[in-house]
Structures are given as structure tokens and as C-alpha cells.
């Protein structure tokens, strides 16, 4: 697990098992397996800010069932540019009643800890929220990357380049100098 600390511009790296809890989560609310979901990857990433937003939402709402969080860009399933590839998005509440999904959406919006909470009319059977960061360079929320940048969006770029056959030598989230 690569956990990017936005506040310190650095990664913490964890070697965890599927049954372990994700770093920094409260109340045993998210295992590595749950975060990974249907992804086949053994390398995952997210941010501390995303986990903090999850914790606030979890504290307010209670247990949050979710099916989709992390995906690698080459696994697809979420379009060309998705915050799921950044490990900062959750599709939640598929098994909740409409009333409970509405409540989750209201809480996620009211807490103001997420960068984006998708309107309910776009996701009628789930609730999507994400914790993107940086100044968006496109509608999907991806920032413009420059040499010297570090973070999960650099990991996505490295991952995409590797998937296209370009050898970036590393999957480390560091664009270099």
C-alpha cells in the first residue's frame, strides 16, 4: 500500500495482508481486501486525506457498505480518467435502501470533507464520493503533472505508461527532477 501524505508530500509504504485494516482507518471500517475490491493488483495506493474523509463519514453515518474503491488504470471499468485509479473514490451503498442512500449522500455532502459527491440523479443505485487533490487540469479532476511532482497522480501516469509499453523503471509516485 502506497499511502500519500499530502501534508508532507511523501509516501508511507505498507506491506499488508488482505485481512489487515487499511492504514489509519477507524473502527475496523475498511480492510485491504475491501479497498482492493475487484482489482487484481497487489499494489494499491490512496491518500491520508482520503482516509480521513472516510473516517469522518464513517463516524457520522455508521458502517458504509461499498463495492468499488481502487482500480489500476489498465484494469478499466471506470472510463479513461477516474478517481478510482487514484485510490481516492468510493462507490457505496449499493445494498442500502434508497432512504439510507439519500442519508449517506446528505451526510457526505454536509460534512464537506470530500472534493466531489456525485449528484444522486447520476448514481441512482449507489453514492459516489472522492477526495481528489491539486488544481484540476481536466473535468475528471486530474492535475497537470510536472517534473518534480510526487503523489498518486504520478503513480497513475507511471502505471499508464508501463501499461502502454514504456518502461518508467519505477512505480514510485515520483516524477523526478
Language-model-detected regions and their locations in the chain:
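Extracytoplasmic cell-surface/polysaccharide-interacting catalytic and binding patches
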Residues: 1-60, 108, 122, 132-139, ...
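Catalytic cores and adjacent binding grooves of peptidoglycan-active enzymes
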Residues: 2-4, 80-89, 94-165, 173
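Short, flexible coil/linker segments at or flanking structured domains
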Residues: 23, 54, 78-81, 117
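Short linear motifs at secondary-structure transitions and domain/linker junctions
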Residues: 41-44, 65-72, 92-95, 101-107
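Extended, low-complexity, intrinsically disordered C-terminal regulatory tails
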Residues: 48-79
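Surface-exposed patches in mature extracellular/periplasmic domains of secreted proteins
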Residues: 62-70, 115-121, 170-172
Amino acid at each position: 500500500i502506497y499511502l500519500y501524505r499530502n501534508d508532507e508530500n511523501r509516501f508511507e509504504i505498507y506491506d499488508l495482508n488482505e485481512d489487515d485494516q487499511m492504514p489509519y482507518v477507524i473502527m475496523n471500517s475498511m480492510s485491504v481486501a475491501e479497498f482492493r475490491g475487484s482489482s487484481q493488483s497487489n499494489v494499491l495506493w490512496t491518500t491520508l486525506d482520503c482516509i480521513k474523509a472516510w473516517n469522518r463519514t464513517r463516524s457520522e453515518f455508521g458502517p458504509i457498505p461499498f463495492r468499488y474503491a481502487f482500480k489500476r488504470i489498465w484494469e478499466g471499468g471506470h472510463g479513461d480518467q477516474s478517481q478510482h485509479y487514484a485510490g481516492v473514490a468510493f462507490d457505496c451503498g449499493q445494498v442500502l435502501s434508497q432512504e439510507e442512500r439519500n442519508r449517506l449522500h446528505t451526510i457526505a455532502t454536509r460534512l464537506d470533507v470530500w472534493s466531489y459527491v456525485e449528484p444522486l440523479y447520476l448514481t441512482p443505485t449507489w453514492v459516489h464520493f472522492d477526495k481528489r487533490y491539486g488544481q484540476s487540469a481536466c473535468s475528471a479532476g486530474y492535475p497537470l503533472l510536472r517534473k518534480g511532482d510526487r503523489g498518486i497522480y504520478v503513480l497513475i501516469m507511471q502505471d499508464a505508461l508501463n501499461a502502454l509499453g514504456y518502461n518508467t523503471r519505477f512505480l514510485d509516485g515520483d516524477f523526478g527532477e
